[in-house]
A protein has these predicted regions:
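Short, charged, surface-exposed secondary-structure boundary motifs
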Residues: 38-41, 98-104, 217-218
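A conserved helix-loop-beta module that forms one wall/lid of the active-site cleft
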Residues: 92-152
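Internal nucleotide-binding/catalytic subdomain
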Residues: 152, 156-302
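Active-site "cap" helix and flanking loop/linker of ATP-utilizing ligase/carboxylase catalytic domains
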Residues: 245-268, 290-360, 368-374
Length: 376
């Protein structure tokens, strides 16, 4: 079979790499891909970004199914486009993807269905938002409602920082439509973890747990990034925590979306804050939902997956995730991000990368933001 993966990052490289391991898979097209996917056996880059043109390609090239990596195509309705043409694709519809594309939608959904999350209010008026900040104090979290390329969340440790964030989004309109509405929520303390599952609309297949680390520098210092590394499994997700997440967050979310008439299919990623209450009992709250695999969490998770990933995706599309199991390498997988100088604020482009093999013993190199130069 031939498969299409949409995206260009390390996440998509890892997804395509794992799909290509299957003896059932002849070729995996990656649109648009990167230098790493261009250099990986059985993968082929596809220079198409228009969603309708991607559907044309899938229809005319006998693509068995399509997997969507990043959030932007999901928010633009790529799943709707493919399904309207009778093409198999794994991911949520534009409507269901609002769990990620609208923070206000997600918070209202969680409140309506009793899913644990931080207390919040939503604002479109800057003065009202400033008044709320003065009332609540700091630390406090300011979130743009829409997708903002990683710039939409400010963890304000002082009231001054919170007021600046409100003005940045609402008054100065620095994030455009994405920041025209903001969510202000209570600051949660504890340890974060990533909990990713596959959903077929009704059944759930959990992936291995993971934890990413966003600070740029060693010792958890420096600015936040898209992620400097991740590992799987996440020790903080004990068997007790695991069951709490499934019972209090994952199952209620899948049921709630169905009850609301917006059936969810695809990868569901719950960003968790794990802590303890006053009596010392563990608690779990939802920081956010994503409607796709995390990056860089995908890389260590895919490295541990022993099952045929293409079979799991097909089960997700066909509504039979209850008929399959995911088997994992019991060893820990660690992913470390190598970033260019100046990352994340002003990454230097054009530096030549050398001495990094695509694959060795127990080591795989996944690419993001790379391309070939004139010398290949």
């Amino acid at each position: 079979m031939k498969i299409l993966v949409i995206g260009s990052g390390g996440r998509e490289h890892a997804l395509a790499w794992r799909l290509a391991q299957s003896p059932r898979v002849e070729k995996v097209y990656v649109a648009p891909g990167n230098a790493g996917t261009a250099n990986t056996p059985n993968l082929e880059n596809l220079a198409i970004s228009d969603l309708n043109e991607l559907a044309d390609f899938a229809a005319s090239n006998d693509i068995a199914f399509t997997v969507v990596g990043p959030e932007a195509p999901l928010a633009k309705g790529v799943v709707n486009i493919f399904r309207d043409r009778g093409l198999k694709i794994f991911g949520p519809t534009k409507e269901a993807a609002q769990l990620e594309s609208s923070k206000d939608f997600a918070k209202a959904f969680m409140k309506r269905h009793g899913i644990p999350t931080a207390e919040y209010e939503t604002f479109t008026d800057a003065e009202a938002a400033h008044a709320y900040v003065r009332h609540k104090g700091a630390p406090i979290v300011i979130k743009a409602d829409g997708l903002a390329a990683g710039k939409g969340v400010v963890v304000a440790m002082t009231e001054e920082d919170a007021h600046e964030a409100v003005d940045f989004m609402l008054q100065d309109n620095k994030l455009g439509d994405a920041g025209a509405r903001i969510v202000i929520e209570d600051y949660l303390d504890g340890e974060e973890a990533s909990f990713i599952v596959m959903v077929d609309g009704e059944h759930v297949l959990p992936m291995a747990t993971s934890q990413d680390h966003k600070r740029l520098l060693d010792n958890d210092e420096g600015p936040n990034t898209g992620g400097m590394g991740a590992y799987s499994p996440a020790p903080v997700v004990t068997p007790e925590i695991y069951q709490m997440v499934m019972d209090q967050i994952i199952y209620p979310t899948v049921r709630g979306m169905k009850e609301d008439g917006i059936v969810f299919t695809g990868f569901l990623y719950a960003g968790l804050m794990i802590s303890k209450d006053a009596s010392g009992k563990p608690t779990v709250k939802t920081l956010e939902f994503n409607c796709r695999f995390g990056d860089p969490e995908t890389q260590p998770i895919m490295s541990r997956l022993k099952s045929d990933f293409s079979e799991l995706i097909e089960a997700g599309i066909d509504g039979s995730l209850d008929k399959v199991i995911a088997e994992w390498d019991p060893r820990c997988a660690l992913g470390v991000v190598l970033a260019s100088k100046g990352y994340p604020t002003a990454p230097r482009k054009g530096d030549v990368i050398s001495g990094v093999e695509l694959q060795g013993d127990d080591t795989v190199t996944f690419h993001a933001g790379t391309k070939f130069n004139d010398k290949g």
